[in-house]
């Protein structure tokens, strides 16, 4: 064989191997492009979380810390989101990422500080003395007198015959006067 033929065979081998590499690279890039378009069309991207799925995910992410449905004031970067948006607006109607979920977790409570406060309560604080028996006896005597002689200054309400609205009015009074009974005790 002449040197020309040898050069031609060598050039042909180089060209064949180059074409093989180019076609493999081209095929691989085409395959990746098809996979990317297929996953985008089927919605395999970031998913949204709503309802029970959102609550379960928040419980899993936040653990024992707990979580908020709306951000507490002054917590996290509030400059990019409006004040009335919560986790439902951010994760149910848009895609939701782990970082966004973690922003709604309650702050970490330091367990060591909580334990030391509990320990201080048990060791440093003096116990409160029990109420003396003399005070208890006075209270019991007052109870007996009240039971024997009911207070005659309170007017007794008598239901009017044939009028069923008094009980409704009474219930309304009870409900509307909670917290400010004026010394009267209502029982439901």
Swiss-Prot record:
Q: From the UniProt record, list the residues forming the propeptide.
A: 115-188
Q: Where is this region: C?
A: 74-85
The family database entries (Pfam families) matched by this protein are listed as: Insulin (PF00049)
Q: What is this protein called?
A: Insulin-like growth factor 1
Q: Report, as the record phrases it, the tissue specificity of this protein.
A: All the isoforms are expressed in embryos, juvenile and adult liver, muscle and brain. At least one isoform is expressed in heart, kidney, testes, ovary, adipose tissue and spleen of juvenile salmon.
An example GO CC term for this entry is: extracellular space
Gene that specifies this protein:
igf1
The scientific name of the source species is Oncorhynchus kisutch (Coho salmon)
Gene Ontology BP terms: cell population proliferation; insulin-like growth factor receptor signaling pathway; negative regulation of apoptotic process; negative regulation of release of cytochrome c from mitochondria; positive regulation of cell population proliferation; positive regulation of phosphatidylinositol 3-kinase/protein kinase B signal transduction
Q: List the disulfide bonds.
A: 50-92, 62-105, 91-96
Note down the stretches annotated as region Disordered. Answer: 115-188
């Amino acid at each position: 064989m002449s040197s020309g033929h040898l050069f031609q065979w060598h050039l042909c081998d180089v060209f064949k191997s180059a074409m093989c590499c180019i076609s493999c690279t081209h095929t691989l890039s085409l395959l990746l492009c098809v996979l990317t378009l297929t996953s985008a069309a089927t919605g395999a991207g970031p998913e949204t979380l709503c309802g029970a799925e959102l609550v379960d995910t928040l419980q899993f992410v936040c653990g024992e810390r707990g979580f908020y449905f709306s951000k507490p004031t002054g917590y996290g970067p509030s400059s990019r989101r409006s004040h009335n948006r919560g986790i439902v607006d951010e994760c149910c109607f848009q895609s939701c990422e782990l970082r966004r979920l973690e922003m709604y977790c309650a702050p970490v409570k330091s367990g060591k500080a909580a334990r030391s406060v509990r320990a201080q309560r048990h060791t440093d604080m003096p116990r409160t003395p029990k109420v003396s028996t003399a005070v208890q006896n006075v209270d019991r005597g007052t109870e007996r007198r009240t039971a024997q002689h009911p207070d005659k200054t309170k007017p007794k309400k008598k239901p009017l015959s044939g009028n069923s609205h008094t009980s409704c009015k009474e219930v309304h009074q009870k409900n509307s006067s909670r917290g400010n009974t004026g010394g009267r005790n209502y029982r439901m």
